[in-house]
Amino acid sequence: MRHRQRPGCEAAIEKHSLEGTRWLICTPSWQHPARAAAKLFGLETAEDDVISSVMEIDETTGCLTGKIETVAYGDGKYEVTKKWCDRNGVDLKDCVFYTDSMSDVLLMEHVGTPVAVNPDARLRAFAKERGWQIVDWGVAEARARKPRYSYGCLNFGGSHVGPG
């Protein structure tokens, strides 16, 4: 996962860590890859330091049920982040939030320091209009070497498809 990280991200993490600032990952990704990323970035407790979309897990089997509990995307990212802050006694106005996505504007509008990272033209214009900080974190190693790709997921109605 580190090969997909923009160079400026590591500098920001180091800066906030040296200042003694608690930082977390807030992503629309599902809980499992989000927690794996948190561990790679050295977060103390991946459970507490990750705000992500959550798929329901069957308590009995430990398997994913296919049901979505939480979506941390768009307005949903604001909602789950606000809940996390309320649970942890954190005021959103004391937070710095870095994003490269226009879908995160609602959360950007509620934090004290919104930062647009490598924004596209639309987010750049929006950030400029509001006087938000705009930064360039460079290009991730993986993106420098190969074109963008997307992921797909197939759901076969909960059945297991495989040999035999």
Sequence positions of predicted segments:
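C-terminal cap/substrate-recognition subdomain and adjoining C-terminal extension
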Residues: 1-164
